[in-house]
Every structure is written in C-alpha cells, then in structure tokens.
C-alpha cells in the first residue's frame, strides 16, 4: 500500500494515543457480535453466546489487544507490510484456515473504534490514511492465500 508522508504522519501520531487493550478488545468483540460466524475461530474462548458475554470475555479482550500490538508492528514497518505479516499470514492460512475476508471486516471495525474514541481528532484525512493501512494489512495477511 502506498502511503504519503502526510498519511504516515496521521497514522503514527494517532497511534501514540491509542489505548491498545481497550480498543483491541472492543474491535474484536464487535467483530464477533456483528459477524457471529467469525466466532468459530474462537471456540476455545468460552462463552461467546451474546454481546455481554463477548465484551466481558477476558480471552476476547486479550486477543484483541494482541491484534492491535500486531498493528503496532505494521506501523513501525509501513513500507513492508507483507514482510511484517508473512508468518501471521501463513498461520491464518495454513493452520487456522481463516477466511481472508475477515481481515477486511476487522480492519473496518478498528477504524470505526478509532473514530468513536477520537471524535473530531479523527479527521477525514486521518480516516483515509487508516483505511489504506487496514486494507494493506488485510492484503498482507491474505498474501499466503494467493
């Protein structure tokens, strides 16, 4: 994905303010609630039977934080997303068999969570930059599927 210097700045400046655990847990929780078929990849997480159970599930919150830590790795390597996510792509493709469309869904939810948390600070230009980033990450994660 090609990001301009301004877009890279928009991403990195906002990233420094993101509450990783809260935002990651919220994003993964929303994915599981809005797209319930995605929960099949998380059967070992325990109770995911309703929104309250999902959003209060410590394993969901912990894995969501882990996802955002991986986004932090992406932000440190904006010019090499495929290399950054090569091992995760292989894991999700070969071992977990995750539908790569799910990466796009989660990326869009992350953008929604950021917009909600940052309000007016999450400008149109910031949203454009983040949409490009999450699309690039989704593409990098889907790389081993091609």
From Swiss-Prot:
Tissue specificity comment: Red blood cells.
InterPro entries hit by this protein: Globin, Globin-like_sf, Globin/Proto, Hemoglobin_b, Hemoglobin_oxygen_transport
Entry-annotated residues carrying Phosphothreonine: 12
Disulfide bonds: none
Coiled-coil boundaries: none
Residues annotated as transmembrane: none
N6-acetyllysine PTM positions: 59, 82, 144
UniProt modified residues of type N-acetylvaline: 1
GO terms for MF: haptoglobin binding; heme binding; metal ion binding; organic acid binding; oxygen binding; oxygen carrier activity; peroxidase activity
Residues recorded as bearing S-nitrosocysteine in the entry: 93
Keywords: Acetylation, Heme, Iron, Metal-binding, Oxygen transport, Phosphoprotein, S-nitrosylation, Transport
PROSITE patterns named among the record's database cross-references: GLOBIN
Binding site for heme b: 63, 92
Domain of life: Eukaryota
Entries under Pfam families matching the protein: Globin (PF00042)
Domain Globin as annotated: residue spans: 2-146
GO CC terms, sorted: blood microparticle; haptoglobin-hemoglobin complex; hemoglobin complex
Keyword Lipid metabolism in record: no
Gene Ontology process terms (BP): hydrogen peroxide catabolic process
Family: Belongs to the globin family.
Subunit record text: Heterotetramer of two alpha chains and two beta chains.
Function field: Involved in oxygen transport from the lung to the various peripheral tissues.
Protein name, as recorded: Hemoglobin subunit beta
The species this protein was found in: Osphranter rufus (Red kangaroo)
Lineage per the UniProt record: Eukaryota, Metazoa, Chordata, Craniata, Vertebrata
